[in-house]
């Protein structure tokens, strides 16, 4: 009874305020009150008032005509005027890849739906394209732009079911039959289905080329507001080396079993605000990525990030740091968020080949239920094959030559979780302890396994109850 009363009081004290997204909002300073660490604040992009409609440039929106050229002409025309809004009226638009330009807002009206063609031949990468690792073009991309946005109440669909490999074990019989009817290849062991690849390409080669739905590379002043992003070939929303990014009131979703279908990934980004957003997807929900190895270290940390008033349903992690952390993670606040039915609630993962340091990370007022795995996990056991081989043979790892994970200075407070396989799991390694992590006012109930810790030190447990008992360090 005491546990129940404490949980109710904590919910009342820290209750979520799911603020309504204000269309065209320019001032986001109110989200930064009472921060546990000072964060550099975001500011909305500046978009001129000039407007055009894609219909004026020949877009049909009939779901049959390929409207890529009309969208490109509209964007180019607005760019020539110094920027403005490209309006997409209600309709169903079939598209190949489109590229945003500086000072442009792509605005989707109610009932405007963008479907991106599954024809891989449309997505061949531009010569010398940066940050793509040889992958095909994303459905919507921007490179080195300033002041860009995608806004409105429309829907953007990547038709990822024509791109993603499928595990038989994750499909019902009817789902499996539907995929096979699309045309493609089932592996000899019957465990995987690969979509049909372009002529002359091996069936599994397309898997290495599929790209993100939205990929924004080295851009400044970015706003995504109100739009639904779904069914991506790979990651859904992926700002990469960007600064001053706002995601306000967006929805990101895919089938629960979609391969590598991360919801939101921030790769080495600075000054980011994610608010009033819902994610329900097949891989990590909202994820911080700091790059791997030397390239990640050179790119610098993910820093000055505020995630507030967000909901995550199915995902591998509600909020995730890693596994790529080499650039580091600094000044990150997650507040007033709900995770329901995720595999893991708060997930911190890395390994010896991709580690980096966390600094000033705060997760506060987090409410979870029906967590399939761990409510909270820190793990340093993501390793590549070479490192795993060396560890298995007892080789002494030279910490100066590998990128050791360093999960420290993380503060988790005011958490309520009902239902989890494991309450809290800390899994370090001899070369990299989990250390100096604080848990305050954490209540986890109905966890099959309460608490487990190895290679961890400096752990503070203040008013922490798992299944009504204090965990033993």
Identify the role of each PLM range.
Residues 98-107, 240, 327, 355-356:
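Short, surface-exposed basic-aromatic patches at helix termini and helix-loop junctions that form
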Residues 325, 345-473:
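Extracellular beta-rich repeat passengers
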Residues 92, 241-243, 251, 290-292, ...:
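Active-site-proximal loop/turn and secondary-structure-junction residues that shape catalytic pockets
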Residues 110-111, 146-154, 220-230, 243-255, ...:
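Right-handed parallel beta-helix
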Residues 83, 94-98, 117-118, 159-163, ...:
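Short glycine/acidic-rich loop motifs that flank beta-strands on beta-rich extracellular proteins
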Residues 2-87, 92-105, 109-218, 223-225, ...:
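Extracellular "leader-to-stem" segments immediately downstream of a signal peptide or signal-anchor
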Residues 60-62, 293-297, 327-328:
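Short, small-residue-enriched loops and turns at beta-alpha junctions
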Residues 206-208, 216, 239, 266, ...:
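Residue-level marker of regulatory loop/turn positions in helix-turn-helix DNA-binding domains and
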